[in-house]
Amino acid sequence: MNDKFSLLKRMRRLSGILVHPTSLPGKFGIGDLGPEAYRFVDFLQESGQHLWQTLPLGPTGGHNSPYQCFSSFAGQPLLISPELLKDEGLLTDADLSNVPHFSDEEVDFAAVGEYKEELFKKAFARFKELPEDNPLKSELALFCKSAHWLDDYAMFMAIKKSKGGAHWLEWEKKYRKPTKSQKAVIEREFEDEILYEKFLQWTFCRQWSQLKAYANERDILLIGDIPIFVSGDSADVWAEPRLFQVDSYGFPTVVAGVPPDYFSATGQLWGNPLYDWKYHKKTNYEWWMERFKTQFLLSDIVRIDHFRGLESYWEIPADSETALNGKWVDGPKDEFFEVLIKTFGEEPPIIAEDLGIITDDVRALRDKFGLPGMKILQFAFEDEDSNYLPYNQPYNCVCYTGTHDNDTTTGWYATASEKARDKVRRYMNTDASQVSWDFIRTCFGSPARFAIIPVQDLFCQGSDCRMNTPGKADGNWAYRMKKELLTSDVAKRLYDVTKLYGR
């Protein structure tokens, strides 16, 4: 990780774009790690950017949320590029000749999943036919040995698919809580399916590593994202229940959420199982350090989602219908970061997502370890002297126009109060006819060390292009950008703003 540190220290004021790979253009119904991802890196370079921030890269479940994945370690198979598989001889031109008609504006995850699964099974069949001395075979074998999480994940997914995707708590006991001897039987029962899941993960990791190397060669750093909590329906909880506060069956006894606030009278009940921090402490946070180790292979900088949960978190009884009955419970605090530093060295490249209910104790934890927090410009214009206004921002922070959880800037301005809109116009000295570019200029001109904009703001897109609306169960995460939007004119305009403000 020393190379990352030297690059970060050398580049004082950095800017970049937030876009999840699923949102990239491409003919297979979803953005992936193929040619369009490389084209996007080229766009970043042409426009003078040095950061590409993504959402978590894991395999998603029913609501397609990257924050509710089947594993904290695995990658999203839907991001695998069929074109790159063709380049390796695992797919043919004929395989890719009859692509269904997919929307270029939003992802139909079910249709894309069905189509890509068909392609991946063809690629897997060809892979198995390769001679044993083929380098790809030895690469997969090496990957399987080095990825400590892979056996459990592959078995979990093989069983899950055989059960029609049912939650693991609904499986028969021999699958739900297998003994060592039962696992050996399951390995034989699902031998081919387990190898297929390993093949997918190896392919994802190879394609991602190649893309990351391409970006890094161009002085572009990747910012990844670690959701603090994991999904209850995950290989993590299934394989390692002792890491979590769950009963002997596997049901959580307490769950995650946040207390009532201005936006929600009953708080938010997320439902994720909570960690057994006493057990983690006994193991010197080994599982967490492995999680960071995996993430640092995928990313140069890591954002910790809901950072405040490491200081203290809202614990809600599992049978509650709202978050009202919760209470604050201490997290691992300083000790967690002391172990992190001992493992990865001083000044680990981490961003603390410090939005929401943030106390002095949370700020003290963030500042003690020198972690940059987040400042969202859309939050800056309702109050007279908001901490989010650029003149109140410290150097050691990340300034965003908005994030994946916010409306686009154009959409936000259209629905903001007249008081906020008036302040925007006066603060930015603008008529707000292209308000997202006013926000981009203000963001890039801020004192913040890092300035990041969601890709939708580059194109002045409205609320219909929003990535996620918190609290809304369906219809999220589907946004895609059209190929023709990434023009040299947009790159030149962004480059000029970037250089004007010394980024």
Please place each PLM-identified region on the residue numbering:
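Conserved, well-ordered alpha-helix/loop/beta-strand core segments that scaffold catalytic motifs
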Residues: 197-230
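N-terminal catalytic cores of NTP/NDP-binding nucleotidyl/phosphoryl-transfer enzymes
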Residues: 16-41
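Catalytic domains of carbohydrate-active enzymes, especially glycoside hydrolases
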Residues: 10, 35-60, 298-299
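Domain-scale activation on soluble regions of proteins
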Residues: 46, 175, 479, 496, ...
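Alpha-amylase-like alpha-glycosidases and glucanotransferases acting on alpha-linked glucans and related
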Residues: 5-11, 20, 64-205, 230-452, ...
